[in-house]
Amino acid sequence: MYKRQAKYYSNLEFDLKEGKRGSRYIHVEEILKEITEAESALVVNNNAGAVLISLNTLAYKKEVIVSRGELVEIGGSFRIPEVMKWAGCILKEVGTTNKTHLFDYENAITENTALLLKVHKSNFEITGFTKEVSVEELVKLGKKVGLPVMKDLGSGCFIDFSKYGLKKEPTVQEVLKAGVDIVTFSGDKLLGGPQAGIILGKKEFIEKIKRNPLNRALRIDKLTLAGLEATLRLYRDEILAIEHLPILKMILISKEELKKKARYLYKKLKELKLKDFEFKIIETISKTGGGALPTLDLTSYAIAVNSRFSPQTIQKALRENEPPIITRIEENKLLIDVRCLFAVSYTHLTLPTKA
């Protein structure tokens, strides 16, 4: 599909059935509604854009109430308070860094309040003496006072990882079922598609967001739409999604499969017959990275490399490999974690031979 859209004609904004101008969003809107049971959907170019346009539409020049402990910063130093400022909203933070109660939200509501916002801490976690208000509690308050509730999931996911023995991560479906009016999340990261910002929720609010002039500036292009549509189609069958989407496959790969990969890489490295290197298969811990699942430890296998060359020198050589192999250094040893290596990574391995 992706290659076809790139090479040939596309019905991006042409309704083939009616023979007139159509909507570019229809290509993914129906699938998103089918998978998540959302009333309506809109896709923009990234999640920061999704948050920006949602806030600008629902709360321009009005107050948005959010917990102090949820004023997150994502990659590149982009912060929720700054996104809110550029959306033209008035930030009203409540609670403390570690504890926010329902009464904090309720006591902060004024005639100028337009939105209750909850932000998922997708790239960090606060532990210890903590308290946060659940989505369900906030939705109940929103209904009581007549205010919409928005949830920014950040790296949203469609699959319940706890079914596979991993730590629970809120799914998009669960958040919608809790009754939020708007939920925003990324099309890449845990979803495994191209970069995009997905907005789901109540039709009355999504329709307002669609009419916002910012939608034109943030709109998604045809190649991204094609890639996202192909990704979403896989989610009609969870097993198919896990089998074909690299991010899901890498997170959920079995320990036995990882050990097989490690043995194969060890064999390929030994075949190089390098005098100044020693290789050893060790057990290690993988992290997901990419602003998702910050506290999840995934048991993995790696090749530990010892050599007269410094770990930094070996690391640089592998980065310049074709294709590049990304490694890490622990306790002055170079580790090649096999979890994220594709089969093509083994075809040509380059290690330093001269100082």
Which residues does each predicted region cover?
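Active-site cofactor/substrate anionic-group-binding motifs, chiefly glycine-
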Residues: K3-S23
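Short coil/turn segments at secondary-structure boundaries
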Residues: L12-E18, L240-H244, E330-N332
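Hydrophobic side chains in well-ordered alpha-helices
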Residues: S54, I209, L265, I314-A317, ...
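Conserved C-terminal alpha-helix-loop-beta "cap" of PLP-dependent enzymes
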Residues: K255, K259-F342
